[in-house]
Design a protein with these regions (language model features):
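Acidic, Mg2+-coordinating catalytic module of metal-dependent nucleases/exonucleases
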Residues: 157-171, 175, 215-292
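Common nucleic-acid-contacting/processivity interface regions adjacent to the catalytic cores
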Residues: 254-342, 346-349, 389-441, 451, ...
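Catalytic palm subdomain of template-directed nucleic-acid polymerases
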Residues: 457-469
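Short active-site loop/helix that positions an aromatic residue
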Residues: 171-180, 341-355
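Catalytic palm active-site di-aspartate
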Residues: 374, 446-460
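DnaQ-like (DEDDh/DEDDy) 3′-5′ exonuclease domain used for proofreading
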Residues: 1-158, 260-321, 329-332, 340, ...
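C-terminal, non-catalytic extensions of nucleic-acid polymerases
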Residues: 467-474, 478-664
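Conserved beta-strand -> loop -> alpha-helix junction used to position metal-binding or nucleic-acid-contacting
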Residues: 183-226, 481-490
Length: 664
């Protein structure tokens, strides 16, 4: 079955939703929820047991007679280490049937609607929308009519996906709360049902976020804040994660917020759309499941479809990581970057060794298939002229690149049923050895190695050209491993490990690393860093000191806009919850939350608080001397703490060695 846009489990069935012209149709297939049992584990009452072949730990599949019986038994079953529970019944159903959402669809075929709830004083003042055809609509007036109109618009427009920004923390909690208060049903699911909500978590990079997970039967809810956080966890070069900042970062022309959300979704969501076509997960789950968990779902589904037992994960253990680091600091001219194409997936395929408990060899077969599919999509994208079809192929290959690169990480995924820490260690060691070999070739040919990341090297070629060096580097690689010389830069500034700046041929500068562009920095610090780095990259020997002097004078004379001195913080929790945690002693005082509590206007989880520091001494309590930026700008009184900000400028200048000639 193709072009399935959504799937929901019900009593004894999996209900599938398909496009049918401007509407949708449904089809039901039998489904029974299940758990996996180890030998000797008691079978839950009323279950039908199917044996699974192979040497895996969980060798029996117990199917429940009803969803109700499953829900009743789960609390007790979860306590047993000899029972494997898959809480997501849609994942169970897609795993057993082999069906996948969005099969043979393109992202442009999705019916998508964007929304933004405009809050008033503890009420909804308006809801702004972009309909699936891209047309804007605004619901305003009586609050009850706004809420009822929103539900009616969803029913009439029938979107597959509702897209918002920070909607799980702000828009939807307010909408559901006000609808309940006014006793207005939000019956806009494809089954006629309302929104459901539960607490959940997701991980983006090294950060874990709590959020309220909203679901609506037959539809998907995509919060673009989550997608932006996931994007930033990889690229690490976004200064802020609010809509105006993302608009500037991605150079989006739209200003109407729902249209901006729509454009942002078309950049961030296609990779997850195409991942959904491969995995036994809903679109929402694909967006928020980590790569390790997603790949485990894929592996487990293939095993269950073949009637094979599922192994128990290996206990986690430490092992040496990939080769990274900075070799030298300073400014370098004529820098090149070489990259081992898909290093760790290539090493896995080259070695031809599956995880030890992957008896069916599905790991390597799947990696090989996805890699071939990705390369074909990449070739098609290169051959096509600019346009929608090319963008689709680019999104497709990008999505598969992410999935392919997760195979190596899965080996060391603690919760992975097929993890293999010994193999992960071997592959990592081989990668380190290979990169070390490339470094030796570079040094032997007179090149300067500047910075290494997990699969590539920044280097300054030797005088007299790179032809012999390129040939030597390529010859150093084993068969099946390809090296790409993928970029050249007029200059590079290496500050410290994983923190560097690149000057591009067009004059633009790209900063990498938290020390150079962290969101914890105030804007004046970011501007000073950029000025200092630019001076060094462009050969302006006195530029960094000149920038320091200009900023010092401006701060001392209260000439720096307050917005450039302000710090921004996103409230991860509601101010009221912060108050309760503070009273219970489970959190520390926070300037942002203290200001939110005393602001005289409502702040919610997910809102941004911008504040600056007042006072007269360099060392002050920020919490006790913070003032909302909005209040300071309205007052017209310049009460910022110049001593505090001058001390921050001095510390930054010192860290860059501006007065002693260090750091390049």
């Amino acid at each position: 079955m193709k072009k399935i846009v959504a799937a929901e489990t019900g009593e004894g069935v999996l209900r599938l939703f398909f496009h049918d012209g401007g509407k949708f149709r449904t089809r039901e297939v039998p489904f029974a929820p299940f758990v996996l049992l180890a030998d000797g584990e008691a079978v839950p009452e009323g279950c039908t047991v199917t044996p699974l072949s192979g040497g895996g730990f969980f060798r029996r599949q117990a199917f429940f007679p009803s969803a109700e019986a499953c829900e009743k038994a789960l609390p007790e079953l979860k306590k047993s280490p000899r029972t494997a529970v898959f809480r997501d019944t849609v994942q169970q159903a897609l795993s057993m049937t082999g069906l996948r959402l969005f099969s043979e669809m393109t992202f442009s075929e999705l019916r998508r609607m964007q929304f933004l709830v405009v809050p008033g004083d503890d009420r909804i003042a308006a809801i702004r929308l972009t309909l699936p055809d891209g047309m804007p609509r605004e619901l305003s007036g009586d609050e009850a009519e706004i809420i009822a109109g929103f539900a009616e618009t969803i029913r009439e427009s029938d979107p597959d996906v509702l897209e918002g920004f920070n909607c799980c923390r702000a828009d939807l909690p307010l909408l559901v709360r006000r609808a309940a208060k006014l006793k207005i049903p939000l019956a806009c699911g494809r089954d006629g049902g309302d929104f459901t909500v539960r607490q959940s978590r997701y991980t983006a990079g090294d950060k874990q976020y709590s959020y309220q997970k909203f679901t609506l039967a037959g539809r998907h809810i995509a919060d673009l804040l989550h997608a932006a956080q996931l994007y930033d966890a990889v690229h690490r070069d976004m200064e802020e994660l609010d809509l105006p900042s993302l608009r500037a970062y991605f150079r989006i022309g739209a200003e109407y917020p729902p249209a901006l959300i729509r454009a942002l979704a078309e950049i961030l969501l296609p990779a997850y759309f195409y991942r959904t076509r491969e995995l036994p997960l809903s679109f929402q789950e694909c967006l928020l499941r980590g790569s390790g968990s997603a790949l485990d779902a894929l592996m487990t589904a293939e095993y269950l479809r073949r009637g094979l037992a599922i192994p128990l994960p290996e206990p986690a253990r430490p092992y040496a990581g990939a080769m990274t680091g900075m070799e030298v600091a300073g400014v370098f001219r004529g820098v090149r970057h070489c990259d081992v194409r898909s290093l760790y997936p290539s090493l896995l395929l080259n070695r031809g060794e599956s995880p030890r408990r992957d008896e069916a060899g599905i790991f390597l077969d799947t990696l090989r298939r996805l890699r071939e599919f990705r390369l074909a999509a990449k070739d098609r994208a290169r051959a096509l002229p600019p346009g929608p079809e090319q963008r689709q192929q680019q999104a497709l290959q990008s999505s598969f690149k992410i999935l392919i690169n997760s195979f190596y990480g899965y080996l060391g995924f603690a919760q992975g049923s097929f993890n293999d820490f010994d193999l992960a260690e071997k592959i990592t060691a081989t990668g380190r050895e290979l990169l070390g070999k490339l470094v030796r070739v570079l040094l032997d040919h007179g090149a300067t190695v500047i910075e290494m990341d997990t699969d590539g090297i920044y280097f300054q070629p030797p005088p007299g050209g790179s032809a012999a060096l390129d040939a030597a580097l390529t010859a150093a690689l084993p068969e099946g491993i390809a090296l790409e010389f993928d970029a050249e830069y007029p200059a590079m500034y290496s500050y410290k490990a994983k923190n560097y700046a690149l000057l591009h041929a067009d004059g633009s500068i790209h900063l990498t690393g938290a020390a150079l562009r962290s969101r914890a920095l105030e804007n004046f610090q970011r501007k000073f860093i950029l000025a200092a780095v630019t001076a060094r990259l462009t050969g302006d020997g006195d530029g960094a000191r000149r920038a320091y002097g200009e900023w010092k004078t401006a701060i001392a004379n209260h000439a720096v806009p307050l917005a450039d001195l302000a710090k921004s913080e996103i409230l991860s929790d509601s101010p009221e919850n912060y108050r309760k945690k503070l009273a219970a002693g489970s959190t520390r005082r926070s300037a942002a939350y203290e200001l939110a509590l005393t602001a005289g206007r409502p702040f919610r989880a997910g809102d941004k608080v911008r504040f600056y520091v007042t006072g007269t001494k360099a060392k002050v309590s920020v919490t006790d001397n913070a003032r909302l930026l909005e209040d300071g700008e309205k007052s017209g009184v310049r009460d910022e703490n110049t001593a505090y900000y001058l001390a921050k400028l001095d510390a930054l200048a010192d860290s860059f060695g501006i007065f002693d000639g260090k750091k390049g």
